[in-house]
Protein backbone atom coordinates (compact mmCIF):
# COMPACT_ATOMS: atom_id res chain seq x y z
CA UNK A 1 0.00 0.00 0.00
CA UNK A 2 1.24 3.48 -0.81
CA UNK A 3 0.11 5.31 2.29
CA UNK A 4 1.43 4.90 5.82
CA UNK A 5 0.71 1.43 7.15
CA UNK A 6 2.06 -0.50 10.08
CA UNK A 7 2.17 -4.22 10.62
CA UNK A 8 3.22 -6.17 13.65
CA UNK A 9 4.52 -9.75 13.87
CA UNK A 10 3.15 -11.68 16.83
CA UNK A 11 4.91 -14.64 18.43
CA UNK A 12 2.45 -16.98 16.77
CA UNK A 13 3.41 -15.66 13.34
CA UNK A 14 0.01 -14.00 12.70
CA UNK A 15 0.32 -10.71 10.80
CA UNK A 16 -2.03 -7.91 11.86
CA UNK A 17 -2.34 -4.54 10.20
CA UNK A 18 -4.33 -2.18 8.02
CA UNK A 19 -6.45 -3.87 5.38
CA UNK A 20 -5.61 -3.50 1.71
CA UNK A 21 -9.18 -2.70 0.73
CA UNK A 22 -8.56 -2.90 -3.00
CA UNK A 23 -8.18 -6.66 -2.87
CA UNK A 24 -11.72 -7.19 -1.62
CA UNK A 25 -13.88 -4.12 -2.24
CA UNK A 26 -12.73 -2.76 -5.62
CA UNK A 27 -14.51 -4.88 -8.24
CA UNK A 28 -14.62 -3.05 -11.60
CA UNK A 29 -16.02 -6.14 -13.33
CA UNK A 30 -19.15 -6.16 -11.15
CA UNK A 31 -22.50 -5.41 -12.79
CA UNK A 32 -24.95 -3.82 -10.31
CA UNK A 33 -28.16 -5.72 -9.67
CA UNK A 34 -31.63 -4.22 -9.89
CA UNK A 35 -31.97 -4.85 -6.16
CA UNK A 36 -28.74 -3.07 -5.15
CA UNK A 37 -28.74 0.31 -3.47
CA UNK A 38 -26.30 2.42 -5.52
CA UNK A 39 -24.36 5.42 -4.25
CA UNK A 40 -22.20 8.02 -5.98
CA UNK A 41 -19.53 9.56 -3.74
CA UNK A 42 -17.29 12.51 -4.54
CA UNK A 43 -13.99 11.37 -3.01
CA UNK A 44 -10.98 13.53 -2.18
CA UNK A 45 -8.24 11.17 -0.92
CA UNK A 46 -5.25 12.17 1.13
CA UNK A 47 -2.06 12.77 -0.88
CA UNK A 48 -0.47 9.49 -1.84
CA UNK A 49 -3.59 7.36 -1.49
CA UNK A 50 -4.47 5.71 -4.83
CA UNK A 51 -7.96 6.39 -6.13
CA UNK A 52 -8.82 2.67 -6.21
CA UNK A 53 -7.74 2.21 -2.59
CA UNK A 54 -9.68 5.26 -1.39
CA UNK A 55 -12.81 4.16 -3.25
CA UNK A 56 -12.52 0.63 -1.91
CA UNK A 57 -12.07 2.01 1.61
CA UNK A 58 -15.35 3.89 1.27
CA UNK A 59 -17.11 0.72 0.12
CA UNK A 60 -15.61 -1.27 2.97
CA UNK A 61 -16.18 1.16 5.81
CA UNK A 62 -19.79 1.79 4.74
CA UNK A 63 -20.60 -1.92 4.59
CA UNK A 64 -18.84 -4.97 6.06
CA UNK A 65 -15.22 -3.84 6.34
CA UNK A 66 -13.04 -2.95 9.28
CA UNK A 67 -9.46 -1.79 9.51
CA UNK A 68 -7.88 -5.19 10.15
CA UNK A 69 -8.43 -8.87 9.49
CA UNK A 70 -10.82 -10.49 11.97
CA UNK A 71 -11.37 -14.23 12.33
CA UNK A 72 -15.17 -13.83 12.42
CA UNK A 73 -15.02 -12.93 8.72
CA UNK A 74 -14.89 -16.68 8.22
CA UNK A 75 -18.32 -17.12 9.84
CA UNK A 76 -20.24 -15.30 7.12
CA UNK A 77 -20.28 -14.88 3.35
CA UNK A 78 -18.54 -11.53 2.87
CA UNK A 79 -18.79 -11.82 -0.88
CA UNK A 80 -22.58 -11.77 -0.53
CA UNK A 81 -22.83 -8.86 1.88
CA UNK A 82 -19.96 -6.51 1.08
CA UNK A 83 -20.30 -3.15 -0.64
CA UNK A 84 -18.47 -2.98 -3.96
CA UNK A 85 -16.86 -0.07 -5.77
CA UNK A 86 -17.70 -0.97 -9.35
CA UNK A 87 -16.65 2.20 -11.17
CA UNK A 88 -14.51 5.31 -10.80
CA UNK A 89 -14.70 8.40 -12.96
CA UNK A 90 -12.75 11.68 -12.75
CA UNK A 91 -14.30 14.98 -11.74
CA UNK A 92 -13.71 17.50 -14.58
CA UNK A 93 -11.30 20.23 -13.53
CA UNK A 94 -10.27 18.47 -10.31
CA UNK A 95 -7.01 16.51 -10.31
CA UNK A 96 -7.43 15.04 -6.84
CA UNK A 97 -11.13 14.17 -6.89
CA UNK A 98 -13.16 11.40 -8.41
CA UNK A 99 -16.65 9.93 -8.30
CA UNK A 100 -16.80 6.45 -6.80
CA UNK A 101 -19.83 4.31 -7.63
CA UNK A 102 -20.64 1.78 -4.94
CA UNK A 103 -23.25 -0.99 -4.89
CA UNK A 104 -24.71 -2.29 -1.63
CA UNK A 105 -26.65 -5.56 -1.37
CA UNK A 106 -30.22 -4.96 -0.23
CA UNK A 107 -29.91 -7.44 2.64
CA UNK A 108 -27.61 -5.01 4.48
CA UNK A 109 -30.53 -2.71 5.32
CA UNK A 110 -33.62 -2.91 7.49
CA UNK A 111 -36.86 -2.64 5.56
CA UNK A 112 -38.54 0.77 5.64
CA UNK A 113 -35.75 2.46 7.60
CA UNK A 114 -34.04 5.55 6.22
CA UNK A 115 -32.37 5.84 9.61
CA UNK A 116 -30.60 2.53 9.03
CA UNK A 117 -29.61 3.37 5.44
CA UNK A 118 -27.97 6.64 6.43
CA UNK A 119 -26.32 5.14 9.51
CA UNK A 120 -24.64 2.61 7.24
CA UNK A 121 -23.80 4.57 4.11
CA UNK A 122 -22.84 7.94 5.65
CA UNK A 123 -21.83 6.79 9.11
CA UNK A 124 -18.21 6.42 10.25
CA UNK A 125 -16.75 6.53 6.75
CA UNK A 126 -16.91 10.35 6.64
CA UNK A 127 -14.28 10.52 9.37
CA UNK A 128 -11.90 8.09 7.70
CA UNK A 129 -8.31 9.36 7.86
CA UNK A 130 -7.39 8.15 4.37
CA UNK A 131 -9.89 10.67 2.98
CA UNK A 132 -9.43 14.41 2.92
CA UNK A 133 -13.12 14.95 2.08
CA UNK A 134 -16.13 12.89 1.08
CA UNK A 135 -19.54 13.84 -0.29
CA UNK A 136 -22.51 11.62 -1.08
CA UNK A 137 -23.76 13.07 -4.37
CA UNK A 138 -26.63 10.72 -5.18
CA UNK A 139 -28.24 7.44 -4.24
CA UNK A 140 -30.42 4.99 -6.18
CA UNK A 141 -33.10 3.16 -4.22
CA UNK A 142 -34.29 -0.04 -5.92
CA UNK A 143 -37.99 -0.72 -6.37
CA UNK A 144 -37.74 -3.69 -4.02
CA UNK A 145 -36.64 -1.38 -1.20
CA UNK A 146 -39.03 1.47 -2.05
CA UNK A 147 -41.92 -0.96 -1.68
CA UNK A 148 -41.10 -1.31 2.04
CA UNK A 149 -41.91 2.38 2.65
CA UNK A 150 -45.22 4.21 3.01
CA UNK A 151 -43.72 7.43 1.62
CA UNK A 152 -45.66 10.72 1.64
CA UNK A 153 -48.80 10.59 3.78
CA UNK A 154 -51.01 11.73 0.87
CA UNK A 155 -49.14 13.12 -2.13
CA UNK A 156 -49.81 15.88 -4.63
CA UNK A 157 -53.09 14.71 -6.17
CA UNK A 158 -54.74 13.85 -2.85
CA UNK A 159 -53.74 17.26 -1.47
CA UNK A 160 -55.32 19.05 -4.42
CA UNK A 161 -58.49 17.02 -3.95
CA UNK A 162 -58.60 17.88 -0.24
CA UNK A 163 -58.14 21.59 -0.97
CA UNK A 164 -60.22 21.65 -4.18
CA UNK A 165 -57.50 23.74 -5.87
CA UNK A 166 -56.23 22.87 -9.32
CA UNK A 167 -54.33 24.34 -12.25
CA UNK A 168 -51.99 26.70 -10.42
CA UNK A 169 -49.26 26.77 -7.77
CA UNK A 170 -50.43 27.24 -4.21
CA UNK A 171 -49.59 30.45 -2.34
CA UNK A 172 -48.14 30.61 1.14
CA UNK A 173 -46.52 32.95 3.63
CA UNK A 174 -44.32 32.52 6.68
CA UNK A 175 -45.55 34.73 9.51
CA UNK A 176 -43.00 37.36 10.54
CA UNK A 177 -41.39 38.28 12.84
CA UNK A 178 -40.57 34.63 13.21
CA UNK A 179 -40.25 34.94 17.00
CA UNK A 180 -41.74 37.30 19.57
CA UNK A 181 -45.43 37.62 18.66
CA UNK A 182 -48.08 36.69 21.20
CA UNK A 183 -50.45 33.93 20.16
CA UNK A 184 -53.30 36.40 19.66
CA UNK A 185 -51.31 38.77 17.44
CA UNK A 186 -49.94 35.78 15.57
CA UNK A 187 -53.47 34.60 14.83
CA UNK A 188 -54.40 38.07 13.63
CA UNK A 189 -51.53 38.04 11.12
CA UNK A 190 -52.64 34.61 9.89
CA UNK A 191 -56.21 35.81 9.37
CA UNK A 192 -55.16 38.89 7.40
CA UNK A 193 -52.91 36.90 5.07
CA UNK A 194 -55.50 34.21 4.38
CA UNK A 195 -58.29 36.74 3.91
CA UNK A 196 -56.13 38.57 1.37
CA UNK A 197 -55.88 35.55 -0.91
CA UNK A 198 -53.22 33.12 0.30
CA UNK A 199 -53.89 29.38 0.51
CA UNK A 200 -51.56 28.74 3.43
CA UNK A 201 -49.68 30.50 6.17
CA UNK A 202 -46.79 28.93 8.01
CA UNK A 203 -45.06 28.68 11.36
CA UNK A 204 -41.38 29.46 11.10
CA UNK A 205 -39.17 26.43 11.59
CA UNK A 206 -37.91 27.61 14.98
CA UNK A 207 -41.35 28.24 16.47
CA UNK A 208 -42.18 25.30 18.71
CA UNK A 209 -43.33 26.43 22.16
CA UNK A 210 -41.84 29.44 23.94
CA UNK A 211 -42.65 31.63 26.96
CA UNK A 212 -44.08 34.37 24.74
CA UNK A 213 -46.21 31.92 22.72
CA UNK A 214 -47.08 28.44 23.97
CA UNK A 215 -47.97 25.96 21.28
CA UNK A 216 -51.51 25.27 22.48
CA UNK A 217 -52.37 28.98 22.50
CA UNK A 218 -50.95 29.43 19.00
CA UNK A 219 -52.94 26.47 17.69
CA UNK A 220 -56.18 27.88 19.12
CA UNK A 221 -55.79 31.41 17.74
CA UNK A 222 -54.64 30.11 14.35
CA UNK A 223 -57.64 27.78 14.19
CA UNK A 224 -59.99 30.70 14.83
CA UNK A 225 -58.22 32.75 12.15
CA UNK A 226 -58.56 29.98 9.57
CA UNK A 227 -62.26 29.46 10.30
CA UNK A 228 -62.96 33.16 9.90
CA UNK A 229 -60.92 33.47 6.67
CA UNK A 230 -62.62 30.43 5.16
CA UNK A 231 -66.06 31.82 5.97
CA UNK A 232 -65.22 35.14 4.30
CA UNK A 233 -63.51 33.82 1.18
CA UNK A 234 -65.30 30.53 0.53
CA UNK A 235 -61.91 28.83 0.01
CA UNK A 236 -60.25 26.07 2.01
CA UNK A 237 -57.34 27.53 3.96
CA UNK A 238 -54.57 26.08 6.10
CA UNK A 239 -51.68 26.94 8.38
CA UNK A 240 -48.59 24.78 8.84
CA UNK A 241 -48.74 24.18 12.60
CA UNK A 242 -45.24 23.16 13.66
CA UNK A 243 -45.52 20.07 15.87
CA UNK A 244 -41.75 19.57 16.19
CA UNK A 245 -41.10 18.84 19.86
CA UNK A 246 -38.46 17.59 22.32
CA UNK A 247 -39.85 14.02 22.24
CA UNK A 248 -41.86 11.89 19.82
CA UNK A 249 -44.58 11.57 22.44
CA UNK A 250 -44.94 15.34 22.70
CA UNK A 251 -44.83 15.67 18.90
CA UNK A 252 -47.77 13.28 18.52
CA UNK A 253 -49.64 15.05 21.34
CA UNK A 254 -49.42 18.32 19.40
CA UNK A 255 -50.44 16.60 16.18
CA UNK A 256 -53.50 15.12 17.90
CA UNK A 257 -54.52 18.56 19.15
CA UNK A 258 -54.23 20.00 15.64
CA UNK A 259 -56.49 17.20 14.44
CA UNK A 260 -59.02 17.98 17.21
CA UNK A 261 -59.13 21.54 15.86
CA UNK A 262 -59.88 20.17 12.36
CA UNK A 263 -56.67 21.59 10.92
CA UNK A 264 -55.81 20.23 7.45
CA UNK A 265 -52.01 20.41 7.70
CA UNK A 266 -49.17 20.29 10.23
CA UNK A 267 -45.44 20.87 9.94
CA UNK A 268 -42.22 19.13 10.97
CA UNK A 269 -38.49 20.01 10.95
CA UNK A 270 -37.31 16.66 9.63
CA UNK A 271 -33.54 17.00 9.86
CA UNK A 272 -33.28 18.48 13.34
CA UNK A 273 -35.95 16.10 14.67
CA UNK A 274 -34.55 13.06 12.87
CA UNK A 275 -35.82 10.49 10.40
CA UNK A 276 -37.28 8.16 13.01
CA UNK A 277 -39.48 10.95 14.36
CA UNK A 278 -40.40 12.05 10.84
CA UNK A 279 -41.42 8.58 9.67
CA UNK A 280 -43.50 8.16 12.83
CA UNK A 281 -45.29 11.45 12.16
CA UNK A 282 -45.81 10.70 8.46
CA UNK A 283 -47.52 7.43 9.31
CA UNK A 284 -49.72 9.21 11.85
CA UNK A 285 -50.66 11.79 9.19
CA UNK A 286 -51.73 9.10 6.72
CA UNK A 287 -53.82 7.34 9.39
CA UNK A 288 -55.49 10.58 10.45
CA UNK A 289 -55.98 12.36 7.12
CA UNK A 290 -53.67 15.30 7.91
CA UNK A 291 -51.25 16.81 5.36
CA UNK A 292 -47.58 17.11 6.36
CA UNK A 293 -45.39 20.10 5.49
CA UNK A 294 -41.65 19.50 5.88
CA UNK A 295 -39.03 22.14 6.61
CA UNK A 296 -35.37 21.37 5.91
CA UNK A 297 -33.81 23.44 8.72
CA UNK A 298 -30.13 22.50 9.16
CA UNK A 299 -29.77 21.20 5.60
CA UNK A 300 -27.04 23.68 4.62
CA UNK A 301 -24.82 22.41 7.44
CA UNK A 302 -24.92 19.06 5.67
CA UNK A 303 -25.12 19.95 1.97
CA UNK A 304 -23.59 23.42 1.39
CA UNK A 305 -19.94 22.40 0.98
CA UNK A 306 -19.19 21.09 -2.49
CA UNK A 307 -16.54 18.58 -1.43
CA UNK A 308 -17.84 17.21 1.86
CA UNK A 309 -21.21 16.21 3.25
CA UNK A 310 -24.43 15.00 1.62
CA UNK A 311 -26.04 16.64 -1.39
CA UNK A 312 -29.61 17.81 -0.84
CA UNK A 313 -30.89 15.54 -3.62
CA UNK A 314 -30.05 12.63 -1.30
CA UNK A 315 -31.84 14.28 1.62
CA UNK A 316 -34.81 14.94 -0.68
CA UNK A 317 -34.98 11.30 -1.78
CA UNK A 318 -34.73 10.22 1.85
CA UNK A 319 -37.61 12.54 2.74
CA UNK A 320 -39.81 11.12 -0.02
CA UNK A 321 -39.32 7.67 1.50
CA UNK A 322 -39.65 8.81 5.11
CA UNK A 323 -42.76 10.85 4.32
CA UNK A 324 -43.85 14.42 3.68
CA UNK A 325 -46.35 16.16 1.40
CA UNK A 326 -44.35 19.41 1.01
CA UNK A 327 -40.66 20.18 1.36
CA UNK A 328 -38.65 23.39 0.95
CA UNK A 329 -36.34 23.25 -2.06
CA UNK A 330 -34.96 26.77 -2.51
CA UNK A 331 -36.17 29.28 -5.07
CA UNK A 332 -33.40 29.65 -7.71
CA UNK A 333 -34.26 33.38 -7.85
CA UNK A 334 -34.48 34.34 -4.15
CA UNK A 335 -32.05 34.81 -1.28
CA UNK A 336 -31.18 31.13 -0.73
CA UNK A 337 -28.62 28.96 -2.51
CA UNK A 338 -29.78 27.05 -5.59
CA UNK A 339 -28.67 26.80 -9.24
CA UNK A 340 -31.56 26.18 -11.63
CA UNK A 341 -30.52 22.91 -13.25
CA UNK A 342 -29.42 21.30 -9.99
CA UNK A 343 -32.51 22.52 -8.12
CA UNK A 344 -34.92 21.28 -10.77
CA UNK A 345 -33.10 17.96 -10.78
CA UNK A 346 -34.04 17.22 -7.19
CA UNK A 347 -37.47 18.85 -7.60
CA UNK A 348 -38.16 16.28 -10.34
CA UNK A 349 -36.90 13.54 -8.02
CA UNK A 350 -39.45 14.70 -5.46
CA UNK A 351 -42.44 14.97 -7.80
CA UNK A 352 -42.04 12.58 -10.73
CA UNK A 353 -42.56 8.83 -10.79
CA UNK A 354 -39.59 8.07 -13.06
CA UNK A 355 -36.49 10.23 -13.53
CA UNK A 356 -33.77 9.41 -16.06
CA UNK A 357 -30.07 9.76 -15.32
CA UNK A 358 -28.88 13.26 -16.23
CA UNK A 359 -25.47 14.15 -14.86
CA UNK A 360 -25.76 17.72 -16.16
CA UNK A 361 -28.42 18.18 -13.45
CA UNK A 362 -26.57 16.11 -10.86
CA UNK A 363 -28.75 13.03 -11.33
CA UNK A 364 -26.25 10.16 -11.33
CA UNK A 365 -28.79 7.33 -11.45
CA UNK A 366 -32.12 6.62 -13.10
CA UNK A 367 -34.70 6.50 -10.31
CA UNK A 368 -37.97 4.55 -10.52
CA UNK A 369 -40.26 5.49 -7.61
CA UNK A 370 -42.66 2.59 -8.20
CA UNK A 371 -45.75 4.84 -8.02
CA UNK A 372 -44.81 6.25 -4.61
CA UNK A 373 -46.77 9.52 -4.14
CA UNK A 374 -44.93 12.73 -5.03
CA UNK A 375 -43.89 15.60 -2.78
CA UNK A 376 -44.84 19.20 -3.58
CA UNK A 377 -41.85 21.54 -3.90
CA UNK A 378 -41.92 24.68 -1.74
CA UNK A 379 -40.13 27.78 -3.04
CA UNK A 380 -39.46 30.15 -0.16
CA UNK A 381 -36.84 32.71 0.79
CA UNK A 382 -36.40 36.30 -0.37
CA UNK A 383 -39.05 36.30 -3.10
CA UNK A 384 -41.54 39.02 -4.08
CA UNK A 385 -44.03 39.86 -6.83
CA UNK A 386 -41.39 40.56 -9.49
CA UNK A 387 -40.17 36.97 -9.04
CA UNK A 388 -43.62 35.51 -9.73
CA UNK A 389 -43.22 34.95 -13.52
CA UNK A 390 -39.90 33.15 -13.05
CA UNK A 391 -41.27 31.04 -10.18
CA UNK A 392 -44.31 29.94 -12.19
CA UNK A 393 -42.14 29.18 -15.21
CA UNK A 394 -39.50 27.28 -13.19
CA UNK A 395 -41.59 25.34 -10.67
CA UNK A 396 -44.87 24.84 -12.53
CA UNK A 397 -48.20 24.07 -10.91
CA UNK A 398 -47.21 21.39 -8.39
CA UNK A 399 -45.48 23.77 -6.03
CA UNK A 400 -46.08 26.13 -3.14
CA UNK A 401 -44.75 29.67 -3.58
CA UNK A 402 -44.18 31.22 -0.16
CA UNK A 403 -43.75 34.95 0.24
CA UNK A 404 -42.96 35.88 3.84
CA UNK A 405 -41.44 39.34 3.73
CA UNK A 406 -42.92 39.59 0.24
CA UNK A 407 -46.37 39.55 1.84
CA UNK A 408 -45.94 41.05 5.29
CA UNK A 409 -43.65 43.79 4.02
CA UNK A 410 -46.39 45.42 1.94
CA UNK A 411 -46.81 49.09 3.01
CA UNK A 412 -50.60 48.71 3.28
CA UNK A 413 -50.52 45.63 5.51
CA UNK A 414 -50.74 41.86 5.39
CA UNK A 415 -54.03 41.47 3.52
CA UNK A 416 -53.04 43.83 0.67
CA UNK A 417 -49.68 42.06 0.50
CA UNK A 418 -51.46 38.73 0.10
CA UNK A 419 -53.79 40.22 -2.52
CA UNK A 420 -50.82 41.54 -4.51
CA UNK A 421 -49.28 38.08 -4.63
CA UNK A 422 -52.56 36.39 -5.56
CA UNK A 423 -53.17 38.86 -8.40
CA UNK A 424 -49.60 38.41 -9.66
CA UNK A 425 -49.92 34.63 -9.53
CA UNK A 426 -53.22 34.46 -11.37
CA UNK A 427 -52.00 36.93 -14.00
CA UNK A 428 -48.93 34.77 -14.64
CA UNK A 429 -50.93 31.54 -14.80
CA UNK A 430 -53.40 33.11 -17.23
CA UNK A 431 -50.59 34.47 -19.41
CA UNK A 432 -48.89 31.07 -19.45
CA UNK A 433 -52.15 29.34 -20.37
CA UNK A 434 -52.59 31.81 -23.23
CA UNK A 435 -49.21 30.78 -24.61
CA UNK A 436 -47.16 33.78 -23.52
CA UNK A 437 -43.50 33.24 -22.64
CA UNK A 438 -43.09 34.16 -18.97
CA UNK A 439 -39.31 34.08 -19.16
CA UNK A 440 -39.40 36.83 -21.78
CA UNK A 441 -42.67 38.66 -21.07
CA UNK A 442 -43.00 38.16 -17.32
CA UNK A 443 -42.34 41.75 -16.30
CA UNK A 444 -44.89 42.99 -18.84
CA UNK A 445 -47.48 40.59 -17.41
CA UNK A 446 -46.91 41.98 -13.91
CA UNK A 447 -47.08 45.60 -15.12
CA UNK A 448 -50.34 44.95 -16.96
CA UNK A 449 -51.91 43.38 -13.87
CA UNK A 450 -50.70 46.25 -11.68
CA UNK A 451 -52.77 48.69 -13.75
CA UNK A 452 -56.01 47.35 -12.25
CA UNK A 453 -54.67 46.15 -8.87
CA UNK A 454 -53.51 49.00 -6.60
CA UNK A 455 -52.16 46.45 -4.10
CA UNK A 456 -49.91 44.95 -6.77
CA UNK A 457 -48.87 48.38 -8.05
CA UNK A 458 -47.63 49.38 -4.59
CA UNK A 459 -45.75 46.07 -4.19
CA UNK A 460 -44.12 46.49 -7.61
CA UNK A 461 -42.89 49.95 -6.71
CA UNK A 462 -41.57 48.84 -3.32
CA UNK A 463 -39.55 45.85 -4.54
CA UNK A 464 -38.57 46.93 -8.04
CA UNK A 465 -34.86 47.07 -7.21
CA UNK A 466 -34.55 44.16 -4.77
CA UNK A 467 -32.33 41.39 -6.17
CA UNK A 468 -30.16 38.63 -4.71
CA UNK A 469 -27.44 38.12 -7.28
CA UNK A 470 -24.72 35.82 -5.99
CA UNK A 471 -23.02 33.00 -7.83
CA UNK A 472 -24.47 29.60 -6.92
CA UNK A 473 -22.08 27.24 -5.11
CA UNK A 474 -24.12 24.12 -5.89
CA UNK A 475 -22.92 23.25 -9.38
CA UNK A 476 -21.97 20.00 -11.09
Curated annotation (Swiss-Prot):
CDD domains cross-referenced by the UniProt entry: RuBisCO_large_I
Keyword Zinc annotated: no
Keyword match Metal-binding: yes
Localisation: Carboxysome
InterPro entries (alphabetical): RuBisCO, RuBisCo_large_chain_AS, RuBisCO_lsu_C, RuBisCO_lsu_C_sf, RuBisCO_lsu_fd_N, RuBisCO_lsu_N_sf, RuBisCO_lsuI
Cofactors, names only: Mg(2+)
EC number of the protein: 4.1.1.39
Keyword annotations of the record: Bacterial microcompartment, Calvin cycle, Carbon dioxide fixation, Carboxysome, Disulfide bond, Lyase, Magnesium, Metal-binding, Monooxygenase, Oxidoreductase, Photorespiration, Photosynthesis
UniProt catalytic activity: 2 (2R)-3-phosphoglycerate + 2 H(+) = D-ribulose 1,5-bisphosphate + CO2 + H2O; D-ribulose 1,5-bisphosphate + O2 = 2-phosphoglycolate + (2R)-3-phosphoglycerate + 2 H(+)
Record-marked site positions (Transition state stabilizer): 335
Cofactor note: Binds 1 Mg(2+) ion per subunit.
Catalytic EC class: lyase
Binding positions (substrate): 124, 174, 178, 296, 328, 380
Annotated Mg(2+) binding sites: 202, 204-205
Active site residues according to the UniProt entry: 176, 295
PROSITE patterns: RUBISCO_LARGE
GO cellular component term, pick one: carboxysome
Modification note: The disulfide bond which can form in the large chain dimeric partners within the hexadecamer appears to be associated with oxidative stress and protein turnover.
Function text: RuBisCO catalyzes two reactions: the carboxylation of D-ribulose 1,5-bisphosphate, the primary event in carbon dioxide fixation, as well as the oxidative fragmentation of the pentose substrate in the photorespiration process. Both reactions occur simultaneously and in competition at the same active site.
More about this protein: The basic functional RuBisCO is composed of a large chain homodimer in a 'head-to-tail' conformation. In form I RuBisCO this homodimer is arranged in a barrel-like tetramer with the small subunits forming a tetrameric 'cap' on each end of the 'barrel'.
Family statement drawn from the similarity comment of this UniProt entry: Belongs to the RuBisCO large chain family. Type I subfamily.
Subunit structure and binding partners: Heterohexadecamer of 8 large chains and 8 small chains; disulfide-linked. The disulfide link is formed within the large subunit homodimers.
Protein name (record): Ribulose bisphosphate carboxylase large chain
Organism in which the protein naturally occurs: Trichormus variabilis (strain ATCC 29413 / PCC 7937)
